[in-house]
C-alpha cells in the first residue's frame, strides 16, 4: 500500500492506494504556516479515521503546487511513517510527451492528471480539474500533452463577487429551482453553476473542433460533481484521478531492491 498526497492551493488530498485501487481519500485545508508536527497529526487522523494500517504502507509519493508546503509535508510523512516520499518534479519518470512552449512550466497536478487519464480512459482526451483554478488539459490521440486552458475556479469567482460588490451575498453551491433567477441569491447560484457549465461546454466544443475529433472528457476536483452534470457534453466523473495518477507514477519510479 502506498500513501499518495496532492497539495493544492486550497485543499490537500490524502489517500492510500493498493493494486491501483484507492483505499481511502480525505481532504484537508492547505495551510502554508502549518508545522511538520501539525501535518503529521493530519496524516495520523486520516489513517485513524479510516482504520488504515500504517505498517502496510511501503512507499509514499506527493505532488504539490504550493512550494511553501512541499518540504513541510515531505518531512511530516517521514516523521509519521519513517518513509521519504517521492516528490513529483524534475527527474521523475512520467512517460508523458509534453508539447507546450516550456514543459517545465506544466504543473505537477496536471502531469499527474494526464498520466492517470492516459492509463484509464480512451484518447484523445480532455481533462477538467476543478480546484482553486479550473484547468483544462488536452491530450492528443497519441497521448501527447497538447496544452490547455486555465480559468477562475467556481469558488474564486464567487469570492471575487462577494468581496468586490456591496450587496451580493455569499451563497451555497446548490441548484436554484429555475435557471432564470428571480432574486439575488438564485441569480448568483444560476450564474455560477450554469455559467461555469456553459463555459466548460464551450471549451470542450472548441477543443473538439480544433482537433477535428470527439474527445473523451474526464472531470475531477472539488466541484466537478456539481458542475459536470449540468454540462451538455458527456463527462466522466473521477474524483480519484489524481490519486490514481500518483499511484502509477510511484510504480514507475519506486526504488528497485
Over which residues does each language-model region extend?
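Phosphate/pyrophosphate-binding loops at sites that engage ATP/ADP/AMP, CoA/4′-phosphopantetheine
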Residues: 43-59, 80, 203-215
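ATP-binding/phosphotransfer module of carbohydrate and carboxylate kinases, centering on a glycine-rich
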Residues: 2-4, 30, 157-257
